[in-house]
A protein has these predicted regions:
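Conserved PLP-enzyme active-site core in the AAT-like
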Residues: 40-198
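Conserved N-terminal alpha-helix of the aminotransferase class I/II PLP-enzyme fold
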Residues: 2-41
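Glycine- and acidic residue-enriched flexible segments with recurrent GG/GxG motifs
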Residues: 1-2, 67
Length: 198
């Protein structure tokens, strides 16, 4: 009985520490206990945004990994959510194209940081455009880069998610992968999965 209890406490402790580290890396308020992988975490972030805003259109930058886009489309196919891809210019999000697509029924914009082409985009103007439209800004970010790049929290992200395998998990036959997600206190109740607190 004592050993089992110690095991449970140890598990809760390391999950809490994982969440704390993700919050430190991303500079966000709260993180969950992880998700399947980075792509499904991004799809879950889309669900969070549509639920929070009660809107059914989501813009996705063409500069994200096409496999992540495929997963988002698969997840949203039967959920009455319209996915609209925003074009790119010089391997960066086309801000003019974004302005034309940013209508009052858009729940969120999804971007990748650094993007699929390895470009570190400056999203400050984009975040302002999205927030002025009362939409949410979702960032799929590589956590191994966040110790040197401007953090999602500093940029003004509402939801940050991604693939945490890059933090050092060895790959074996196509896995294991680890999706992470962090958000603001305002969106805490919409966060999927489990949260370990103290």
């Amino acid at each position: 009985q004592g050993k089992k209890r110690t095991g449970e406490i140890s598990t809760l402790q390391y999950i809490f520490e994982f969440q704390s580290m993700i919050c430190e890396l991303t500079n966000m308020d709260v993180a969950n206990a992880s998700l399947y992988d980075g792509a499904t975490a991004t799809a879950e972030a889309v669900f969070m945004a549509t639920s929070q805003t009660r809107r059914n259109k989501v813009l996705v930058s063409k500069t994200i990994n096409p496999r992540i886009l495929d997963v988002i489309k698969t997840y949203t196919k039967y959920r009455d959510i319209e996915i609209i891809v925003v074009d790119m210019v010089d391997f960066c999000l086309d801000k003019e194209a974004l302005r034309t697509k940013l209508t009052d029924d858009v729940a969120a914009l999804v971007v990748q940081y650094p993007n699929y082409y390895g470009v570190i985009e400056d999203f400050q103007e984009v975040v302002d455009l999205v927030h002025n439209n009362k939409s949410l800004f979702i960032m799929n970010a590589d956590p191994s880069t966040l110790s040197v790049l401007k953090t999602p929290g500093e940029i003004g992200c509402d939801i940050v998610c991604g693939e945490a395998q890059t933090l050092g998990i060895p790959l074996n036959f196509g896995g294991p992968y680890l999706g992470y997600m962090a958000t603001t206190n305002k969106l805490l109740r919409k966060l999927p999965g489990r949260i370990v607190g103290m």
